[in-house]
């Protein structure tokens, strides 16, 4: 089998040296992706296309599908390469190849020709088109908007019968631009923004700020692995996980409510910039869109950017949510994003949309920056190729109950502000308050002879914190969902 890879048009308008470099990189990327399907596969680069030849017919569909997902490819032609002697020979071969497709259809013939011949491309189109029209009674020539277009390519003494055309994702080959670090949360925005930078030729590494234990991290790892495996598997990339619960706890405990959102983002940018510097990455990528939430106003984004010299790229800055969700659906991350949990208690109730630098800096003086340094130092760096195996590990299950027994105590893990606004009172059982950001350090001080029923408004944080406590060896925890 043979495929002809057509280059993304922006590649073809580059200078000769740049174009050759892009083609060389794309050829290497294709080899890296396809070597898993057929070890005998050959990839040959030319000035205006790349040929892929393989022997294993069983891998035809898999190879074709993989090619449509490699950045830098405009479209793929699946072809049959045969010798020919003259125009009549071209017609006879086209008749055998296309007869069934043209029955009862309107059609036209389009020919591209390279080399020296005693006929032109138009001569071949007329001869082959006329012959097909005469020999297939139910077919009819229609030069504008035909139902079927017969594509032929003539190169020297070879005829390429084009059996199918398949659209690629376009863009630049990965590796033609410098590396970036994507701040991935598993939601709609970060997945789409990561894809857009891969499509633009960047090797995208991932940085994840963990707020909810192993279950949360496993979910986001699956999104990152999916994106890499589907669009970026030609290159090795890193997945860096940072346990950000201590940072969130420090913010919730010491920072004024209205400034929490901006300061949390500033802390994330500081941490990600340190990771980027450690690995020689040139820029950060976020999924922020202008005005989508309170921290994404121009004033707040400027204040967030000010904490780092690292370039921050925001490919979705002018996109609306509907457009982003449609893109997520196209690339296959929509289902991941819809099931990714939201975290109660992390977002302030009255966030500022126009933060003042002096106020932000005054609030940050209350923050213990040694906590930020520590979580960055302890960040977990994994080769993304290992994630498939690691995410298969069993996540400890935790029981969810809607009632309680005589030895049970409800543990309200919401933030202090939420508890003050909506105190939890349940008849017949004691309720103890312990904000989620203190669980890792204070849960062991509670009476371990009791069974603790963790509760929060949405039930997401309580489940994740119960999973975390189970992983730490506390088996006396359940999730309370009345």
Swiss-Prot record:
Q: Where is the active site?
A: 456 (cysteine persulfide intermediate)
- Which reaction equation describes what this protein catalyses? [ThiI sulfur-carrier protein]-S-sulfanyl-L-cysteine + a uridine in tRNA + 2 reduced [2Fe-2S]-[ferredoxin] + ATP + H(+) = [ThiI sulfur-carrier protein]-L-cysteine + a 4-thiouridine in tRNA + 2 oxidized [2Fe-2S]-[ferredoxin] + AMP + diphosphate; [ThiS sulfur-carrier protein]-C-terminal Gly-Gly-AMP + S-sulfanyl-L-cysteinyl-[cysteine desulfurase] + AH2 = [ThiS sulfur-carrier protein]-C-terminal-Gly-aminoethanethioate + L-cysteinyl-[cysteine desulfurase] + A + AMP + 2 H(+)
Q: In which pathway does it act?
A: Cofactor biosynthesis; thiamine diphosphate biosynthesis
GO cellular component entries: cytosol
Q: Which GO terms describe its biological process?
A: thiamine biosynthetic process; thiamine diphosphate biosynthetic process; thiazole biosynthetic process; tRNA 4-thiouridine biosynthesis
- Source species, domain of life: Bacteria
Q: Which residue intervals define the domain Rhodanese in the entry?
A: 404-482
Annotated ranges, domain THUMP: 61-165
Q: Which InterPro entries match?
A: Rhodanese-like_dom, Rhodanese-like_dom_sf, Rossmann-like_a/b/a_fold, ThiI_AANH, ThiI_fer, ThiI_N, THII_Thiazole_biosynth_dom, THUMP_dom
Q: Which keywords annotate this record?
A: ATP-binding, Cytoplasm, Disulfide bond, Nucleotide-binding, Redox-active center, RNA-binding, Thiamine biosynthesis, Transferase, tRNA-binding
Matching PANTHER family, A to Z? TRNA SULFURTRANSFERASE
- Family matches, as HAMAP family: ThiI
Its name, as the record gives it, is: tRNA sulfurtransferase
